[in-house]
Amino acid sequence: MQIGFMLHVVAIGQATPTLTGDKANLLDMLKRSIIRYLPTLLLLASSLNGVVPSAKGQTKHRTYFQDPAVPMISLPTQFTSYRSNSDRRIPEAGQIDIARLKGPGCVRHIWLLPGDHTSLEVRVDDAPEPQIHVPLKPFFGIMHGLSPYPINCAAYSVFPNPLPGLPGTPGYNLYLPIPFAKSCRITLRGPKGERAVAMTDWHRYDNDYFLTPFRLHASHRLEKPSDPRGSYFEIADIKGSGFLAGVVIGYIQKNHSDMVFHTGGMTMLLDGETNPHVIRGHNVEDDFGFTWGFNDQQTRWAGCPWHVNRGRLDQDGVFYRFFGPDPVAFNSSLLFRTGSRGDDVESVAYYYLDVSASNTTRMVSPEEWEVVGLWPLNVKEDWERLVPLPKNTWPETVFEGDRPHKVHRLKSQRGWIDLQHVYFEKHHGATPLTMLNHAAYARTFIESSRVQKLQLKLSLDDTAVVWWNGKKAATLYHQEDFKTGLIEVKSIKGRNTLLIKTINTDAPMNKRMWAIHVAVELEENPSTFSGKEKKPGQGAKKKPKANK
């Protein structure tokens, strides 16, 4: 397990090279890693020895297998098989349970014959909120209210009935495992009289078997239309420790200036609270394993179950991608986005969260930013040059001579400032590629109740120059990869100014990526620091949720 790496920093003034990683989270990370990989260790031990001592001193065979749809989930090979049946209709109350199970156990397969306007709800271990509350058809990859079409992938299958005019006739089959320690309640919600016919196949385990800490969740999004070209469509905003199991997304083209797939691709902003790093895609078809558009093909892990091609600039489609062989893990959070271009977009993300994780952090991120740009980088001497900028609140436009530069007022999200959807090629209607060989300035104000030492934690994949209270603090060169630097500064009592010149060139491997992450590592009470500018007469307020 990688805990941190040595950072290359060009130290100027207060900058200090150091190891990354939040020490306060180290023990928690080790604990979670042990719990996460314990089934694999037990599987190895059982394969070598065949038996493991039980709590009562007797020997008992304890072997585990990897789930074929989600190999990150390891489950006991010793179990009792059960089936819960439902053959009813939704009553006046608008909901009905199709299964109520007592654990420890795991749902292995659900077959459903539902109505056409039904939503699926799954609540395990008496959680205060259901882990899954999604319209049933999108959950199974039938997007935008379309008539069901055949789907055959690792996570689920849909078998439409060829007879027309029979509502609720497709057979929906779910193969994503649903582990639970205490209980599992599966509910269908919908109009009175809709079918609620189901068979739920599940395994029950003895209490002394280790059960995976991962619990299945789903996130549903629908925008009609989505934001215009160059913006992003948020697939999921996840807090916690876990991994991404899959995604399905459907497009109905409304913007006919270019192909519907040319959105700029997916972005994953991971672990902003602990170890910021990124995963960047290309375009939609590339992210789902295709090239040069889509074809009506399905495989176990990626496919296109529905596609309408009325011409190059008029296509609709639904595409799935499941990460069985290559799961995307995160320790504290995941922001999952894809490019947007004004089309109708619907998505479902499937992920597992680790219920054993504590998710504590002692870092605070500035919330409100002023960003201004762009400045071309003609020669390398331009990189560290500071353009004169107003000291007070920036106006809507900043002028350098007679050249205007628009000011953007952004809110960070889990510490991330995503500039690829601010600065992109706007002179054409095709893929909105991120601007290269340009610089922008990002400024925020940090309130401190006293003089104290702070560690600025800045993550990026190119170059940045940092000024703290008007003095240059560091220059960071990260052209080879997305890395994190710690810069030691000393605050004054009251308002402190952090100014970052962020540079995007074609040097890094991820040249489509332009995002930075900023946080402050605290050694003492976080109440002595505020990442939000305090206005006169303003008292303490709860930190608002970041938004798009």
Functional labels for PLM-detected ranges:
Residues 45-54:
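C-terminal segment of classical bacterial N-terminal signal peptides
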Residues 174, 320, 442-444, 483-487:
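Short strand-edge motifs at loop-to-beta-strand transitions and within beta-strands
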Residues 467-487:
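Solvent-exposed beta-strand/loop surfaces of large extracellular or lumenal domains
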Residues 357-428, 497-548:
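Accessory carbohydrate-binding/adhesion or oligomerization-edge regions at the termini
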Residues 58-362:
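Beta-strand-centric surfaces of beta-sandwich/beta-rich domains
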Residues 27-39:
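Bacterial N-terminal signal peptides that target proteins for export
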Residues 448, 452-467, 498:
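Aromatic-lined ligand-binding clefts that engage carbohydrates, nucleic acids, or primary amines
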